[in-house]
């Protein structure tokens, strides 16, 4: 399970290191292979263990092709999906297309969300969490939870 927010640095070549605490989990779950793709609602990236992506991909492919929103989601999620492998130092090289999509510079935030991560530019991450609207409604599913 991935959780927490981690400040990480991307070098000039576009390489970034996955935090050490997740490397063994990723090695066990997917032999260090991850799939990175575009987020459909925010200018950030989604990072999945390859095994998790393999379960999600058929669901994305099954979306109705005549639904404009579904087609856009397919284009973003599948069109940007890139399989990457952690090197011996736990680093991956993010392709320029993904870096450009998420407007990345040197400082990034890797945010654990259970079975996946979100990868944000540090500036966009802090702007998004500062932009919490008190009028935002909780999803119905959360109303039954006791935290």
From Swiss-Prot:
Domain SpoVT-AbrB positions: 5-52, 81-124
InterPro entries linked to this entry: MraZ, MraZ_C, MraZ_dom, MraZ_N, MraZ_sf, SpoVT-AbrB_dom, SpoVT-AbrB_sf
Keywords, alphabetical: Cytoplasm, DNA-binding, Repeat, Transcription, Transcription regulation
Annotated Pfam families: MraZ (PF02381)
Gene3D superfamilies xref list: Transcriptional regulator MraZ domain
PROSITE patterns membership: SPOVT_ABRB
Leader sequence segment: none
Superkingdom of the organism of origin: Bacteria
Compartments, record wording: Cytoplasm, Nucleoid
GO biological process: negative regulation of DNA-templated transcription initiation
NCBIfam families documented for this protein: division/cell wall cluster transcriptional repressor MraZ (TIGR00242)
Family: Belongs to the MraZ family.
Protein known as: Transcriptional regulator MraZ
